[in-house]
Regions:
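Membrane-water interface regions at transmembrane-helix termini and the short interhelical loops
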Residues: 1-3, 27-42, 63-80, 131-138, ...
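Membrane-embedded translocation segments of transport machinery
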Residues: 179-504, 526, 551-553
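N-terminal alpha-helical transmembrane segments of multi-pass membrane transport
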Residues: 1-127, 245, 577-583
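Flexible loop linkers connecting adjacent transmembrane helices
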Residues: 32-38, 65-84, 109-134, 156-182, ...
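Helix-loop-helix module between adjacent transmembrane segments
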Residues: 3-4, 15-23, 57-59, 96-100, ...
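Hydrophobic alpha-helical segments of multi-pass membrane transport proteins
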Residues: 15, 48-65, 263-274, 406-417, ...
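Intracellular leaflet-associated regions of eukaryotic membrane-associated proteins
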Residues: 1, 593-741
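Transmembrane-helix boundary/entry motifs in multi-pass membrane transporters
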Residues: 1-7, 41-47, 76-94, 122-141, ...
Length: 741
């Protein structure tokens, strides 16, 4: 018998299978559309991705230094279900996945020999160190933050408050019983979809590396053939499906331990086969470099390279200023043409100095943040599931610090070997200074003796390849990790076979862990869903991975990651507040205990047709609430006036305040509705909308303060964005007390 939340499962399935069908039917159109979505998000929300990661980081570090670190995920007398090795291996295998092998060499080489200048660079040694540091930044503390945040919130709320293990439960301290309706179903559906897209991003990236590794061991395997990649996806999906059917302890736990152990043996085998002292030096230096620069990198939004990209676009100059004549003004007509021409001039580019490619933020940092965030529901819930009996402090240190340090060691070792090989090849093959420009990162692969597909073509490059060395910047990215173990003679084949096994096992652990979490959410936290449900979610992941691989490769995979990460970024912001309230409740915080948990009515009741099971006895009937919301959409005067009077404002000033806010709303609507208004007028309309939000948020704050209702100003601003519902809520609150109405 199925145990499933049909609403959440149907919503998630519709989104996932709708996307799969769309991609398979229209590969070109879907790829183009995903690229357009990605461009819009990166143009408008780069600042949000960057600042939220840093704020979450500060919040988690703060918790580690407070009394809240001693709160246990479970009963106070409960002991952990897994020992440290099992716990760590499952976290690492689930949280890092196949990406560690895909990017550990490819990413540093891309920075080392690419248009990247994020840190001060005066020579090639510093360019090499920058490449390692940027890689650590993308795989470091900022990446694990979303995981830990979700894990702690679910662990505290579910294990100490008896809530089911689903993502909706993380918001219980914030929204109470309202999460049991359609709002909670939507959260779980979003979590399932985000998890599946996030896992399939890794699967889409990993299958290319698997195909390349198989080709290296058996030349009959075509690494570029879609049929080969699809076969790999479904074979591994079948194994992952078997693992998830066996369950957490019998399948996932054992597979994770094997996967982690193989990776450990491979890593130390490579260290011993190479120069361990060089690699240890690189690790220590890279750790110091990371600590030195992580703050600057963490707040970097690529402001100036992005502005230069606009300047290079002759059709985009009007975005730089609001000229009185718009696109017909001097900026658009004259400077656009001349400026774009000047920016292609080598002398001007030299004068501006070494620059970072304007696509760096989209291709790398935002892709990573979207990718980590899209994995957060899945990995965070998985960590919470295996961390029962441990404290908040243990989760932060064990799931935040330990995996990061071990990941740094892995990335530094493999990345350093890649850069060392690149340098050796360049020194051996360079015949003129122009072959390699360390300042810009440009490499002339033809002069170094490589074809477009990365095959050595000259006597020098062929001889170098026989000795196991390649100019990696001229090679296919999927072969980088295989190339760096070529110099080790007879051990090379063994290492490459171990790499293939490790990648496949990481592929499986990511897939089975993702399927397990999808099962858990769709079954409303029931820990042993029927086999049919497990098979369904595993097959959905396989189908989505196939769709991503066949629709446009890495670019589409990266785009989907960024798009999926955005909505869950907003959810994680609310989760921070929810976790904070849950922890304060554990210590019976006096100020929090004396406050009301919410307004008399909830804005989310609209999702239940204004007939929620949690509606109080004093809540207005459905007709009253519908009329109030519709009226406030266009005429907020009465609601604002009542709310201001309810907080003690003089009736005259309350009326003036209501009139001003109503005027702001009508101005915004008028400008947006005007067919003659240009882009500038529409921008002014949005400015008036922001003013409206500011005004309503502050009125809501005053109402909360007068009624001693729990909340904060950020919640008020979020509520004010849906101003008809927020105003109706305040109006009903005022009317509930005749003395203040």
């Amino acid at each position: 018998m199925l145990r499933i939340n049909w609403v959440s499962a149907a919503l998630a399935s519709s989104l996932l299978w709708g996307f799969i069908i769309w991609v398979l039917v229209d590969e070109t159109g879907s790829s183009s559309e995903v690229t357009r979505w990605t461009g819009w998000i990166t143009s408008n929300f780069t600042w949000l991705y960057i600042v939220t990661q840093d704020v979450w980081f500060i919040f988690i570090l703060y918790l580690l230094g407070t009394k809240y670190k001693d709160v246990k995920l479970g009963r106070d007398d409960e002991e952990p279900a897994f020992d440290y090795y099992e716990w760590f291996s499952m976290m690492f295998a689930c949280g890092i996945g196949v990406g560690l092998y895909t990017f550990s060499v490819m990413e540093p080489i891309s920075y080392y020999r690419g248009a990247v200048s994020k840190l001060p660079i005066v020579n090639d040694d510093q360019r090499a160190q920058q490449a390692i540091t940027l890689t650590l930044f993308h795989w470091g503390l900022h990446g694990w933050i979303p995981y830990v945040l979700v894990a702690m919130t679910l662990g505290v709320v579910c294990y100490r408050h008896g809530r089911p293990m689903t993502i909706r439960s993380a918001f219980y301290p914030l929204f109470g019983e309202n999460i049991n309706g359609l709002f909670g179903d939507a959260i779980d559906a979003l979590s399932i979809a985000t998890t599946t897209f996030g896992v399939c991003t890794s699967l889409g990236l990993g299958v290319t590396t698997i195909a390349s590794t198989m080709n290296r061991l058996n030349s009959d395997v075509d690494p570029n053939d879609d049929a080969t990649k699809i076969l790999i996806i479904w074979l591994i999906t079948a194994v992952a499906c078997t693992s998830v059917i066996l369950g957490l302890k019998n399948g996932i736990r054992r597979l994770s331990k094997i996967t982690f152990s193989i990776g450990l043996i491979l890593l130390f085998g490579i260290i011993v086969a190479d120069n361990p002292w060089f690699l240890l030096n690189s690790f220590v230096q890279s750790m110091g470099h990371y600590v030195q620069w992580v703050t600057q990198l963490g707040w970097d939004t690529d402001t100036w390279p992005a502005s230069e990209a606009i300047m290079r676009d002759t059709g985009a100059w009007h975005y730089l200023a609001w000229g009185a004549k718009g696109e017909s003004g001097a900026i658009a007509r004259t400077l656009s043409t001349r400026g774009a021409t000047n920016l292609t001039d080598t002398e001007l580019n030299t004068m501006w100095g070494v620059r970072t490619d304007d696509g760096f933020m989209n291709t790398w940092t935002l892709f990573y943040w979207g990718w980590w965030i899209s994995w957060a529901p899945f990995v965070g819930m998985f960590i919470a599931r295996i961390s029962r009996g441990r404290t908040v402090g243990e989760v932060i240190k064990g799931a935040f610090i330990a995996p990061v340090l071990f990941g740094f060691f892995y990335l530094t070792v493999l990345g350093s070997l890649g850069i060392k090989m690149e340098r050796i090849a360049e020194l051996a093959l360079t015949t003129a200074p122009a072959d390699v420009d360390w300042r810009s990162g440009d490499v002339n692969c033809t002069n170094l003796g490589y074809a477009d597909d990365g095959t050595p073509t000259t006597a020098g490059s062929i001889q170098l390849a026989k000795e196991g060395y390649y100019a990696l910047s001229c090679r296919p990215t999927s072969s980088h990790i295989l190339d760096i173990v070529e110099p080790y003679g007879k051990l090379s084949t063994l290492f490459q076979a171990m790499i293939l096994i490790a990648i496949i096992l990481y592929f499986i652990t990511s897939s089975d862990s993702g399927s397990y979490v999808d099962d858990l959410i769709s079954a409303m936290g029931y820990e042993n869903p029927p086999v049919l449900q497990k098979v369904y979610w595993a097959c959905t992941e396989g189908a989505l991975a196939q769709a991503l691989v066949t629709s446009g490769g890495l670019k589409v995979v990266q785009g989907v990651s960024i798009v999926c990460g955005l909505p869950f970024t907003f959810a994680l912001n609310f989760m921070v507040v929810s976790l904070w309230r849950a922890l304060k409740d554990e210590f019976n915080d006096e100020a929090q205990q004396k406050t009301r948990k919410g307004f008399n009515t909830c804005m989310l009741d609209v999702l239940e047709g204004y007939e929620p099971e949690t509606a109080g006895a004093n809540a207005p009937d459905r007709k009253t609430r519908v009329v109030a919301a519709l009226k406030n959409f266009i005429y907020p005067f009465d609601a604002i006036r009542k709310a201001k009077i309810a907080v003690g404002t003089d009736e005259k000033f309350a009326s003036i305040n209501a009139a001003v806010v109503t005027g702001v709303l009508w101005t915004a609507i008028g400008l947006l509705a005007s067919t003659k208004a240009g882009a500038g007028a529409h921008s002014v309309a949005w400015l008036f909308y922001l003013i409206l939000i500011f005004c309503i948020a502050n009125i809501r704050r005053e109402v909360r303060a007068s009624r001693n209702i729990l909340g904060n100003i950020m919640e008020d601003y979020t509520a004010a964005a849906l101003y008809p519902l927020a105003l109706a809520q305040m109006e009903h609150e005022a009317e509930s007390d005749p003395k203040l109405a």
